[in-house]
């Protein structure tokens, strides 16, 4: 993750972007940039945890650098785009919008959610899990993996999760849009090996 001042998350987002690019190119598509939604925490870092735990995040559009780029160019672009989200008011504005949608009647809320969901291919999330191993019913957990929910007709969910010093990446794909998702996973693995 030291290349171009990038974080581990930047490297993984770049690799996901490259995998999508290669997957589409192998099927004869010109891989223009595609957007995914990424959750952004809107709870202040210094805020104490509330009595009742819960998430306080907004889904923000992240244009993935899926067009044809060299690996280091793609990494630099992934970092630039991720940094842009971190310094944008979009998360706070989106959180307010999602809160308002949640208060609308069900039919209106569904239409609005479907409208916004159609702007992205899916959701990509990075979850920092426990840094040390955990036990469940006396047995040490060897790994954990999460699955990303999707909305509307979104076709691809990517969950990046770290646990006990290991990062795992899970892909969830709509079989009608990505009938050979294993090839997308192999493209990701190949990208991580370069």
What are these regions (language model features)?
Residues 1-6, 78:
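Surface-exposed, Lys/Arg-rich phosphate-binding patches that contact polyanionic backbones
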Residues 3, 14-23, 63, 81-85, ...:
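Generic, well-ordered alpha-helical scaffold segments in large soluble proteins
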Residues 4-5, 63-68, 173-178:
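A generic structural motif
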Residues 4-47:
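Hydrophobic "lid/gating" helix adjacent to the active-site nucleophile
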Residues 22, 44-48, 106-112, 143, ...:
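Glycine-rich, charged/polar anion/phosphate-binding loops
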Residues 48-130:
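Helical lid/core segments from catalytic subdomains that handle acyl or acyl-like groups
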Residues 118-193:
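Low-complexity, glycine/alanine/valine/leucine- and proline-rich hydrophobic stretches
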């Amino acid at each position: 993750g030291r290349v171009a001042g990038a974080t581990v998350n930047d490297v993984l987002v770049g690799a996901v972007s490259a995998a999508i690019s290669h997957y589409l190119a192998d099927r004869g598509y010109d891989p223009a940039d595609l957007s995914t939604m990424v959750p952004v925490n809107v709870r202040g870092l210094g805020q104490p945890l509330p009595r009742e735990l819960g998430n306080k995040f907004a889904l923000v559009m992240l244009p993935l650098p899926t067009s044809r780029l060299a690996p280091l160019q793609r990494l630099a672009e992934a970092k630039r785009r991720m940094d842009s989200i971190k310094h944008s008011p979009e998360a706070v504005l989106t959180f307010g919008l999602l809160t308002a949608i949640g208060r609308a009647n069900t039919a209106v809320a569904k239409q609005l959610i479907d409208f916004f969901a159609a702007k992205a291919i899916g959701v990509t999330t990075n979850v920092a899990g426990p840094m040390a191993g955990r036990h469940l019913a006396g047995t040490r957990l060897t790994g954990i993996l999460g699955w990303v929910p999707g909305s509307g007709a979104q076709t691809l969910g990517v969950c990046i999760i770290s646990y006990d010093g290991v990062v795992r990446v899970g892909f969830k794909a709509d079989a009608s849009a990505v009938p050979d998702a294993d090839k997308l996973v192999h493209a990701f693995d190949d990208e991580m090996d370069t």
